[in-house]
Amino acid sequence: MVQITKGKFDGLQRLSNDKGVIAALAIDQRGSLKKMIQQAKGTENKKDVEDFKQLVSEELTPYASAILLDLEYGTPAIKARHEGSGLLTSYEKTGYDATTPGKLPDLIEDLSALRIKENGGDAVKILVYYDPDEPAEINEIKYAFLERIGAECRAVDIPFFLEPITYDATVTDSGSLEYAKLKPAKVKASIKEFSKPRYGVDVLKLEVPVNFKYVEGFAEGEVAYTQDEAARHFEECSDLSPLPFIYLSAGVTSEMFHKTIQFANQHNVQYSGVLCGRATWADGIEVYGKQGDDALREWLRTQGKENITSLDKLLDEGAVPWWTKYGSFEDVHVVEKQ
């Protein structure tokens, strides 16, 4: 049996579908989305980013249990979402300061967990870049940072979703074969660390533990893992986490993310859903940039809808309810926050 405070429980339920699975859409990208729209359209305008997010939210949240948004460009999209769709809100600043080592995180100055909750947020989401092999003087800063977020979320009784993005300080190309060989150990180390109760994390938003570009049978060139090795990494990560976890799409194509989730399904991985971003909507950016709002809306109603509903079918086949890590639904004991 596990005790969960009412605010956290209610938030998790609002973010889940009727099976307890988090089938969520992510569009909290800021700097990267701005650049993508600018490249497609040839102009830079905050309203373009807001409008793109709003259209995606309006058209695709009827098929998502929740949406992840930011308050910098996402307020119109928050208002436009389907009434049954929960809301995760980003608390961290976009990107990191490249002039200092360690990819240190920072928070949006005029935001707090309380303000996120007051704005209708059902959960706080934090992204942190993490290399378990960085020196202690860097990682201790990140650990303390996340301890503070956990305490803040506990204080206002809102779920805390943590997204650790792994990297290696010496291998700078995260898409390389060299990093692909390091990635499984890095992801496992992040699960071990951030599952500790001291951080107060409720759901881990995880990278898949391998780069599918280098999995035998999926790779077009060099191979870093056999399919059996890849399956073992998935299973070990699943077993390592005492917390519910969901997968992020990490910028891959819709087709590749679907193959990834199929692979997880085939190996009985206990994941509780996805937060899928660019894999769902990225191809609509070119349509929006070249042809405008109406063309994007049409694309979202056809290809965008197909991307998300076909993923929903895969989740129906393989994802488990968020409470599975705690046993059954009856094993979750909801208590009032003291």
UniProtKB/Swiss-Prot annotation:
Q: Which reaction does it catalyse?
A: D-tagatofuranose 1,6-bisphosphate = D-glyceraldehyde 3-phosphate + dihydroxyacetone phosphate
Q: Which GO terms describe its molecular function?
A: 6-deoxy-6-sulfofructose-1-phosphate aldolase activity; tagatose-6-phosphate kinase activity; tagatose-bisphosphate aldolase activity
Keyword Lyase in record: yes
- A Pfam family of this chain: DeoC
Q: Which UniProt keywords apply?
A: Lactose metabolism, Lyase
**What is one GO biological process annotated to this record?**
D-tagatose 6-phosphate catabolic process
SUPFAM superfamilies, per database record:
Aldolase
Q: EC number(s) for this protein?
A: 4.1.2.40
Q: What class of enzyme is it?
A: lyase
- Listed InterPro entries: Aldolase_TIM (IPR013785), DeoC/FbaB/LacD_aldolase (IPR002915), LacD_aldolase (IPR050552), Tag_1.6-dipho_adolase (IPR005927)
Would the keyword Lyase turn up in this protein's UniProt record? yes
From what superkingdom does this record's organism come? Bacteria
Pathway info: Carbohydrate metabolism; D-tagatose 6-phosphate degradation; D-glyceraldehyde 3-phosphate and glycerone phosphate from D-tagatose 6-phosphate: step 2/2
- Please give the family membership noted in the entry: Belongs to the aldolase LacD family.
Extract the PANTHER family matched here: SULFOFRUCTOSEPHOSPHATE ALDOLASE (PTHR39340:SF1)
What is the recorded name of this protein? Tagatose 1,6-diphosphate aldolase
What lineage, starting at the top, does this entry show? Bacteria, Bacillati, Bacillota, Bacilli, Bacillales
